[in-house]
Amino acid sequence: MIRKLKFSALGVALTCTLAALSGTALAQSTIFNIPSTDVVAKKKTYFEFDFIGHLESDKNGGFQTYVPRVVFGLPKNVEVGVNVAATHSAAPAIVYVQPNIKWQFYANEKAGTAFTAGAIAYTPLKDRKTIDSFGLLYANGSKKFSGDHGARLTLGGYGVVDYDGAGANGKKATKGGVMVGYEQPLNKKVSFVADWFSGNNALGYVTPGFSFALPKNGLFNIGYSVGNRAKKNNGLFVYYGITF
């Protein structure tokens, strides 16, 4: 059981959600797990609540992770935010605070391209002597293809700083890799979306699912995360986001 970058409980719930629909006017900071090339607009706020769970009893490896997150848009295409990820399982509860920053340093709407770079810090609220603090650095780019149903493809790379955890199979964790995202509008309100972090670490998951545009700048995503390694390293992933 890994938790999103965290390591344990589905990669601390997929690293507690690093947490954009190409087919809508909405922008979100992540697809499912990987960062998108979107940033929150200046003076806007994005709020999101994630649930990630392996739907078995705790004694059989089940867990539930809850992740509220808020992101603020700043000048010069910069956003800053914070996530709080709490995981319940048979093991002691894990709570991570994750301040983060992203900079969209290039965007060409006509060409459908954008590039971003960012960083996320992961710090446990308790048990700091036994649970690692670490950081994530990344850069990525995206290409939005033309047409009413034009897909967006995102490619990038990441590195984990000061992380000494084991991989999902008990072997030494990898400290870097690639990330891939795909967003395919099906109609004006629904898109098929998927993303993947390579690596044998808390980030190493593939998550396919669907994204639904809601009224008043809302968004609902539902998918299923499957770990790159280990049995039962998977979980339902649901989130709601809104920009205001």
Locations of regions flagged by a protein language model:
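Short loop-to-alpha-helix "cap/lid" segments that border enzyme active sites
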Residues: 173-182
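Transmembrane beta-barrel domains of Gram-negative outer membranes and organellar outer membranes
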Residues: 26-153, 157-165, 183-191, 195-197, ...
